[in-house]
C-alpha cells in the first residue's frame, strides 16, 4: 500500500507541475477567466482531456498477486487493473468548467480506458461519466457565484469522487471477490492522493488568479492615485512648471530611476538619475525620444546605446518612452528611466501602455476645459465690450434718430442689431464657426458703428467664395476689427481704412489678415500684445490675449496671432488649417 501511495504521488506531482506551468501562461489565465463562454469550454475540454489521457497512460498496473509496475501503457492484459490519477483530472475539469466540460472529459477518459483494456474496463467508463457530471454540478454552483470551489471543498469533492470510483468497481465488476481485494489495496492510497492532488490543483488555479487580481488592484490603485495627483497639472498644459510637478509625482509613486517629460522640441522636466545633464530648456538629447516623436509609438530599450544619450557618464541603462497625444497629434513624450535594465519588466511595460492612454486623455480633457473657459471668457468679454449697455443704448439712440429721417435705414439697423446679439450668443457656445458666419457678424457690428460715425471708417472685405466655409474661432475677425476701430485711429475723423482678406498660405492652410492704416503700436507694448493683458485708455487688451490662446489651443502654436506695426499702420494675421464645414 505504501509503495502504491508513493507511485501515485509521483503521478500527481507531474500533474501539479503541468498545472503550475499552464497557470503561468497568460493565455491560459485569460481562458480561466472566460470559462463560462462556449469557446472557452471547448478549449478546456481539449486541455483536460489531454490531462486525463496522460493520467491513463502513466497509471500503475496491478495484477492478481498485487505486483505493481509503473510505465507508459497503451494496452493492458485482461487480468490486470490500473491505479491512476484519472479521477483527479476529471474532477478538476468539472470543478473548473462545469457539467459540460466534466462530462466531456469523463467520456473521453472512460473511452480511452476501455480501449486500453484490463479487467472490467467498462466499469471505468461508467465511473468516469458519473464523476464528470457530479464534479461539474459542484463547479456550476461555484460558477453561479462567480467563484471557484474552495480548497477544502475541492479536497472533500476529491474524496467523494474516489468513493464513487470504488463503489462503481464493487457494483459493476463481474468478479466480486477480485473487486473487493482490489478496493482493499487501492482505496486508501487513491482517496488520499487524488483528493490532495485535487486540492493542490485547485489551489494553484485560485492562488494564481487571486495574485493576478491583487496585482491589478495594486496597479489600478497606483494609476488612480497618479491620475488624481497629475490631473490638476495636466490641465495647465505641457509647460515646464506642470511637467516638473508631474515628473516628481510619477517618480515618487513608481519604482523608476528617473522620469522626464518633453515637448516636441525640448526637455520640459527631468527628475532623478541623469538630471545633471538632462536639463530642462535644453534640446532633446536622446535619439530614442526623437524616434518616438517621429513614429508616435511606445518604445522600450534595455541598453545605454539604445537610449542614445551622448553624455559619457550617463547612468541610465534602460527606458520606456511613451508618446503623449492630443487630438491624434504627438505633443510630447513621457520617459521612465532605469539604472538597472532588470527593473524594466513586463509589468512596467503594461503600466506604461495604460498611462500613455490616460495621460493623453488628461491632456485632451485639460485642453477642452481650457478651451471651454476661454470660450466662456470670450463670451463675457464680447457681451461686456461689444454688447454693453453703453453700446446698446448708443445703437438704440442712433436708430431712434434715424426713424424720423430715414425709417428704412432705421429698420435695417434694428435688424442688424438683432442679428448681432443673436450671433454673439450663438458664437459663444461653439468652438468654431464658418468664416461666412463670422463675416456676417462683423458686417452687423460695422453697420451699427458706421451709423454712429458716418464716413469715419472705410471697411474693405476681400474674401473669395471658396474660403467662406473655412472654420475659424468665433469672434476672430470681429475682435481684430474692433481693436482697430478703438485703438488705431485715435481722434482721426476720416481716411481710416480697415482691410479684411483671406489668402492661400499653402495647399492645406489659409492666412486671415486684418490691416489698418492707423498710427501703429508703440514699441513698449508690441512684445506684450497677444501674450498678456495690455492696459490702455479704452481697454485691457485681454481680448487679444484670449483670442491668441484660443487659436493656439484649437490649432497649435503655428496658428498663433502675429502682427507687424509701423507708424503707417498695423497688420494682424494668423494661419489656420483649410478645414471646411462638412455638408449636412
Swiss-Prot record:
Effect of substituting residue 394 to A: Abolishes phosphatase activity
A Gene Ontology cellular-component term: plasma membrane
GO BP of this protein: cell wall organization; signal transduction
Spans through the membrane: 6-28, 40-62, 88-110, 123-140, 155-172, 184-206
Domain GAF: 311-362
Gene inactivation effect: Deletion significantly reduces target tissue survival during calcium-daptomycin treatment and increases susceptibility to host defense cationic antimicrobial peptides.
Modified positions (Phosphohistidine) in chain numbering: 390
Pfam families: 5TM-5TMR_LYT, HATPase_c, His_kinase
Amino-acid biosynthesis as UniProt keyword: no
Chain coiled-coil ranges: none
Listed SUPFAM superfamilies: ATPase domain of HSP90 chaperone/DNA topoisomerase II/histidine kinase, GAF domain-like
GO molecular function term, any single one: ATP binding
Keywords from the named record: ATP-binding, Cell membrane, Hydrolase, Kinase, Membrane, Nucleotide-binding, Phosphoprotein, Transferase, Transmembrane, Transmembrane helix, Two-component regulatory system
Membrane topology annotation: Multi-pass membrane protein
Cellular location(s): Cell membrane
EC number(s) stated in the UniProt entry for this protein: 2.7.13.3, 3.1.3.-
Reactions catalysed according to its record: ATP + protein L-histidine = ADP + protein N-phospho-L-histidine
Residue ranges of domain Histidine kinase in the record: 363-580
Posttranslational modification: Autophosphorylated on His-390.
PANTHER family named among the record's database cross-references: SENSOR HISTIDINE KINASE YPDA
Record function comment: Member of the two-component regulatory system LytR/LytS that regulates genes involved in autolysis, programmed cell death, biofilm formation and cell wall metabolism. Also participates in sensing and responding to host defense cationic antimicrobial peptides (CAMPs). Functions as a sensor protein kinase which is autophosphorylated at a histidine residue and transfers its phosphate group to the conserved aspartic acid residue in the regulatory domain of LytR. In turn, LytR binds to the upstream promoter regions of target genes including lrgA and lrgB, to positively regulate their expression.
Name the record gives this protein: Sensor histidine kinase/phosphatase LytS
The species this protein was found in: Staphylococcus aureus (strain NCTC 8325 / PS 47)
Amino acid at each position: 500500500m505504501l509503495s502504491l501511495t508513493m507511485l501515485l504521488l509521483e503521478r500527481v506531482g507531474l500533474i501539479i507541475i503541468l498545472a503550475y506551468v499552464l497557470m503561468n501562461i497568460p493565455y491560459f489565465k485569460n481562458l480561466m477567466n472566460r470559462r463560462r463562454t462556449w469557446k472557452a469550454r471547448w478549449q478546456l475540454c481539449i486541455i483536460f482531456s489531454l490531462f486525463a489521457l496522460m493520467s491513463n497512460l502513466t497509471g500503475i498496473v496491478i495484477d492478481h498477486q498485487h505486483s505493481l509496475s509503473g510505465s507508459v501503457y497503451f494496452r493492458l492484459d485482461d487480468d490486470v487493473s490500473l491505479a491512476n490519477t484519472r479521477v483527479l483530472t476529471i474532477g478538476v475539469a468539472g470543478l473548473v468548467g462545469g457539467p459540460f466540460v466534466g462530462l466531456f472529459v469523463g467520456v473521453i477518459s472512460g473511452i480511452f480506458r476501455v480501449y486500453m483494456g484490463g479487467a472490467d474496463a467498462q466499469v471505468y467508463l461508467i465511473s468516469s461519466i458519473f464523476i464528470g457530471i457530479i464534479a461539474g454540478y459542484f463547479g456550476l454552483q461555484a460558477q453561479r457565484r462567480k467563484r471557484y470551489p474552495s480548497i477544502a471543498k475541492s479536497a472533500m469533492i476529491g474524496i467523494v469522487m474516489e468513493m464513487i470510483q470504488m463503489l462503481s468497481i464493487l457494483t459493476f465488476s463481474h468478479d466480486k471477490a477480485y473487486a473487493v481485494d482490489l478496493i482493499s489495496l487501492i482505496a486508501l492510497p487513491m482517496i488520499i492522493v487524488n483528493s490532495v492532488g485535487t486540492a493542490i490543483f485547485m489551489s494553484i488555479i485560485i492562488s494564481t488568479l487571486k495574485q493576478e487580481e491583487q496585482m491589478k488592484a495594486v496597479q489600478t490603485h497606483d494609476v488612480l492615485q497618479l491620475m488624481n495627483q497629475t490631473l490638476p497639472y495636466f490641465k495647465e498644459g505641457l509647460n515646464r512648471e506642470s511637467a516638473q510637478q508631474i515628473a516628481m509625482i510619477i517618480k515618487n509613486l513608481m519604482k523608476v530611476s528617473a522620469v522626464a517629460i518633453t515637448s516636441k522640441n525640448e526637455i520640459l522636466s527631468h527628475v532623478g538619475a541623469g538630471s545633471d545633464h538632462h536639463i530642462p530648456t535644453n534640446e532633446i538629447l536622446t535619439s530614442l525620444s526623437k524616434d518616438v516623436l517621429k513614429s508616435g509609438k511606445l518604445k522600450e530599450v534595455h541598453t545605454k546605446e539604445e537610449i542614445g544619450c551622448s553624455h559619457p557618464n550617463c547612468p541610465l541603462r534602460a527606458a520606456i518612452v511613451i508618446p503623449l497625444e492630443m487630438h491624434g497629434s504627438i505633443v510630447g513624450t513621457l520617459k521612465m528611466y532605469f539604472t538597472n535594465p532588470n527593473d524594466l519588466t513586463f509589468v512596467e511595460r503594461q503600466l506604461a501602455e495604460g498611462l500613455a492612454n490616460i495621460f493623453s486623455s488628461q491632456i485632451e480633457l485639460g485642453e477642452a476645459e481650457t478651451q471651454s473657459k476661454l470660450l466662456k471668457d470670450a463670451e463675457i468679454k464680447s457681451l461686456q465690450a461689444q454688447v454693453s449697455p453703453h453700446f446698446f443704448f448708443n445703437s438704440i439712440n442712433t436708430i431712434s434718430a434715424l426713424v424720423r429721417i430715414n425709417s428704412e435705414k432705421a429698420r435695417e439697423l434694428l435688424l442688424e442689431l438683432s442679428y448681432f446679439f443673436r450671433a454673439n450668443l450663438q458664437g459663444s457656445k461653439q468652438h468654431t464657426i464658418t468664416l461666412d458666419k463670422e463675416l456676417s457678424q462683423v458686417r452687423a457690428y460695422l453697420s451699427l458703428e458706421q451709423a454712429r460715425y458716418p464716413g469715419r471708417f472705410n471697411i474693405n472685405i476681400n474674401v473669395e467664395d471658396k474660403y467662406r466655409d473655412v472654420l475659424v474661432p468665433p469672434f476672430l475677425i470681429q475682435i481684430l476689427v474692433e481693436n482697430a476701430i478703438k485703438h488705431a485711429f485715435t481722434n482721426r475723423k476720416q481716411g481710416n481704412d480697415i482691410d479684411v482678406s483671406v489668402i492661400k498660405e499653402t495647399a492645406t492652410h489659409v492666412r486671415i489678415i486684418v490691416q489698418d492704416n492707423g498710427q501703429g503700436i508703440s514699441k513698449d507694448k508690441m512684445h506684450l500684445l497677444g501674450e498678456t493683458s495690455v492696459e490702455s485708455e479704452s481697454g485691457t487688451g485681454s481680448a487679444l490675449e484670449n483670442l491668441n490662446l484660443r487659436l493656439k489651443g484649437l490649432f497649435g502654436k503655428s496658428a498663433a496671432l502675429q502682427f507687424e506695426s509701423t507708424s503707417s499702420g498695423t497688420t494682424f494675421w494668423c494661419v489656420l488649417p483649410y478645414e471646411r464645414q462638412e455638408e449636412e
